[in-house]
Amino acid sequence: MSVRKADDFIADVERQFDWYLTKAGWEVADCYLDPVEATCQLLAQHPNLGPRGGFTHPRLREWRFFLVSRPFNQHILFYELARGDIVMRRAMRGQRDLPRRLLELPGAQ
């Protein structure tokens, strides 16, 4: 399967990269991108690896999730299967009230 990255997913990853760049420096920020991409490629090979999120909102109902590879395994990638592709929808740190956060625009407080 091929991987498509939605605009919100790209914005989430860029925002997290910028956070690591500011807080921890270039080396850590640059190291963040490899595990994210490796996780996307793993899901392309094994699309059913991530379980469904169990969300009730219609937009999120079919979304699946999977943890980013170590050492960034506090980050969750949300995706869905669509027309033979994996569509990466969001990327964020695991936290409470995920359904609400997933429906917000990237960077919303």
Describe the role of every protein-language-model region:
Residues 46-86:
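Basic/aromatic recognition patch in beta-strand/loop cores that engages polyanionic ligands
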Residues 1-35, 39:
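Arg/Lys-rich, positively charged N-terminal/basic patches that mediate binding to nucleic acids
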Residues 18, 41, 45-49, 71, ...:
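Generic structural signal for secondary-structure transition and capping sites
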Residues 29, 51-55, 100:
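Short, hydrophobic secondary-structure boundary micro-motifs
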Residues 69-109:
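Enriched for short, Lys/Arg-rich terminal
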